Amino acid sequence: AAWAENMDVMWLLRGIPCIYYGSEVEFQAGAPCDKGPNGPLANTGRAYYGQNLMGNVSAENFGLFQADGQVKKTLEHPLARHLQALNRIRQAVPALRKGQYSTEGCLSNGGRAWKKRYTSGDVDSYVLVCMNGDATFTGIENGTYKDAVTGDVKTVHDGKLSTSCAGRGNARVYVLGGT
């Protein structure tokens, strides 16, 4: 859950997300980075990862793939699936990639909440994000919001949206206009 939460922050809040190979399967989780010049790398965070990539992958569109061999198991790991979903959501919502971040009017109970907006030309992307707890967003635009994670739809008439998102690593991503 901690890794999923970390990835939520990297993909939904900040600029360009970056992870090291192996993060998507928690490769060598808990292993020391280095045991000195005489320690075997196989027992460290710098162990060889290549065996996790053996097999064939054919990809299309964004995050859709067919795979076989060990790489299929790697890509089907729950954390890898979480990362794939975050990539699809981020790709579909311009505000997550380029938007201005704000916490004004974002009240969270037990988690984090923020909003982002991006406008350019005919693009106007507005998103409300809640992680790991309940959140209430006030002073927001009226309209229909769709959660990119669950598909839940909320219609706002009074500039206020409330949502619940219990548990570490969980997020709600309400997009104005539902795109």
What feature does the model see in each segment?
Residues 156-179:
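C-terminal beta-strand-rich structural cap/linker in extracellular carbohydrate-active enzymes
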Residues 149-150, 157:
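Short, ordered coil/turn segments that flank beta-strands lining enzyme active or ligand-binding pockets
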Residues 1-142, 150-151:
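Loop/helix patches that line or flank the sugar-binding groove of alpha-linked glycan CAZymes
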